[in-house]
Structure formats: structure tokens, C-alpha cells
């Protein structure tokens, strides 16, 4: 892709296990609302703040993200964290993007409003806040008073519809043999069943197709 000195890059960093329509809608809404040139999805290698018993292999999460965004020319996926060993820190990734484009881009960082409430626990959070513009996605009716006044002055609030979709629920539904159609793109659904992700071997792929 081509980034000019006037360009703005939005950076959406998550586990994506799996990526779903909630992620995609939020990214597209941010691109349109803030007039961004592109959205870069960055699957984490080893998430620091989201310790789960197990997450899918990085390559699976990367390929599902590639499939999910393939029909949107404004979306791309980066392996910047997957290629870097050890825990994934946002500050390292943002700095790497800035160096890559000779500091000629403005980076927007999409996160949920609840996640931003924990920003002070992030590694080098004060420096991170200075390097990029945060976009905090909220649901209708979200109590903005939960955000510190200081935070409200440094972030942009973006309200999105209450899409009740979560990666955790999708994994659970696959384990229980329930349908995930219309929660994830068809290509991602197909990939999950083909690679037997999130389920016991005895569960059939009866919901595919």
C-alpha cells in the first residue's frame, strides 16, 4: 500500500480468535467516520492483558483475518507482531509502524472503551498515548462517566450498534456444535471447520454450507 505524508493509518490490534463481524463493522465504521486511508489488522502473538488457557496458533488467526478482509480494499493484515518473538506490546508495534513509514503517518488505535479504562496498566502507556490517537468504541447507552475526564480529552469516542458477538461465544458455539453462520464471514466459518478449530473431534461440521 502507499502512505503519503498526509495519510492516516488506523491500527486494530487484537487476538482475532476468531475474527468476526463485530471486528469488521467497527473497523469500517472507524474508517468512514474518521476519513482514514486504511485499516491494518494486527493479530497478537502473545497477548499480555488477555491471558486465556489457550489460543489458536498464530498462523490460523492470521489466515482467518486474511480471509475475512479479502473483499475490502481498505483493509489489510500485518504479521508485524507474529514475526516478533515474545509478548506483544502495543508500544513496540506502534513504534515499528512509525519507523516503517518514516514518521509520515498519523496512527489511530481502535480499542473498546472498557479496554481503554485499563490503559494505565499497559506497558509504557504514557508514551503510547503520545504516539497515536485512540478511538474508543462504545455501545449505545454506554456510561461515558466511567471514563476519566483526562481520558475524554485524549480519545475519540465512536458509538457502534450493540452487536452482541464475541470470539469467546463463537468458540463455545463451535465446541457445542451450534451454528456460527452470520457471526463470522463464510470463508472464516469454512476455515474453522476445515481445520477443526475450537471443537472436539466428535463434533460434526453439520452447520457448514
Spans of model-derived segments:
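Glycine-rich phosphate-binding loop and adjoining beta1-alpha1-beta2 segment
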Residues: 54-68
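Conserved Rossmann-like nucleotide-binding pocket used by diverse enzymes
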Residues: 11-12, 78
Amino acid at each position: 500500500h502507499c502512505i503519503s505524508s498526509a495519510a492516516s493509518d488506523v491500527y486494530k490490534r487484537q487476538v482475532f480468535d476468531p475474527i468476526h463481524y463485530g471486528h469488521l463493522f467497527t473497523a469500517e465504521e472507524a474508517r468512514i467516520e474518521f476519513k482514514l486511508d486504511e485499516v491494518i489488522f494486527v493479530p497478537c502473538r502473545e497477548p499480555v492483558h488477555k491471558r486465556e488457557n489457550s489460543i489458536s496458533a498464530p498462523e490460523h488467526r492470521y489466515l482467518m483475518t486474511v480471509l475475512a478482509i479479502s473483499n475490502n480494499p481498505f483493509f489489510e493484515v500485518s504479521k508485524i507482531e507474529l514475526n516478533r518473538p515474545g509478548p506483544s506490546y502495543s508500544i513496540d508495534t506502534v513504534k515499528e509502524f512509525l519507523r516503517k513509514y518514516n514518521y509520515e503517518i498519523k496512527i489511530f488505535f481502535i480499542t473498546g472503551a472498557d479496554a481503554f479504562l485499563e490503559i494505565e496498566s499497559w506497558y509504557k502507556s504514557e508514551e503510547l498515548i503520545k504516539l497515536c490517537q485512540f478511538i474508543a468504541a462504545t455501545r449505545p447507552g454506554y456510561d461515558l462517566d466511567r471514563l476519566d475526564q483526562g481520558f475524554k480529552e485524549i480519545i475519540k469516542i465512536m458509538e457502534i450498534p450493540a452487536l452482541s458477538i464475541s470470539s469467546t461465544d463463537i468458540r463455545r458455539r463451535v465446541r457445542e456444535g451450534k451454528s456460527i453462520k452470520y457471526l463470522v464471514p463464510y470463508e472464516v466459518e469454512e476455515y474453522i471447520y476445515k481445520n477443526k478449530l475450537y471443537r472436539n473431534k466428535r463434533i460434526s461440521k453439520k452447520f457448514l454450507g
